[in-house]
């Protein structure tokens, strides 16, 4: 009975606008940052290297990017109110659920093969076409 009451309370705070994503996807996470009395949106773009699904309120995903030659990883709670939106930019073709091996790779070796899909098509149109 107590578990049902807790589940009912948690259900109000769960996000319903989540895109379909998995490890290997390139994502753009828009987070709300509070600086003093102002609030702004900061974008963190990278590859999902882990997606931990657990109880509805405890799901998390880890995004990795390389910034100025330094690898940066950030963990996000899926249902966090600090996340404004999550955009899937492309789908990477991987056969693993945890891509921790990317930490040891550099340059072209760290790239993932991009699969064709709705997110990948949008990214392809954004790139300039060679003349």
Curated annotation (Swiss-Prot):
NCBIfam families: rplS_bact. This is Large ribosomal subunit protein bL19. This protein is located at the 30S-50S ribosomal subunit interface and may play a role in the structure and function of the aminoacyl-tRNA binding site. Belongs to the bacterial ribosomal protein bL19 family. Keywords: Ribonucleoprotein, Ribosomal protein. InterPro entries: Ribosomal_bL19, Ribosomal_bL19_sf, Translation_prot_SH3-like_sf. It comes from Anaeromyxobacter dehalogenans (strain 2CP-C). Pfam families: Ribosomal_L19 (PF01245). GO terms for molecular function: structural constituent of ribosome. GO terms for cellular component: cytosolic large ribosomal subunit.
């Amino acid at each position: 009975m107590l578990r049902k009451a807790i589940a009912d309370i948690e259900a109000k705070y769960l996000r319903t606008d989540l895109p379909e994503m998995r490890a290997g996807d390139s994502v753009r996470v828009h987070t709300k940052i509070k600086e003093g009395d102002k609030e702004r949106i900061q974008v963190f773009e990278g590859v999902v290297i882990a997606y931990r699904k657990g109880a509805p309120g405890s799901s998390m995903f880890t995004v990795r990017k390389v910034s100025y030659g330094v690898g940066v990883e950030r963990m996000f709670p899926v249902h966090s109110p600090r996340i404004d939106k999550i955009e899937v930019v492309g789908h990477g073709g991987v056969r693993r659920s945890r891509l921790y091996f990317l930490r040891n790779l550099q340059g072209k070796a760290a790239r993932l093969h991009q699969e064709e899909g709705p997110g990948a098509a949008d990214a392809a149109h954004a790139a300039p076409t060679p003349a």
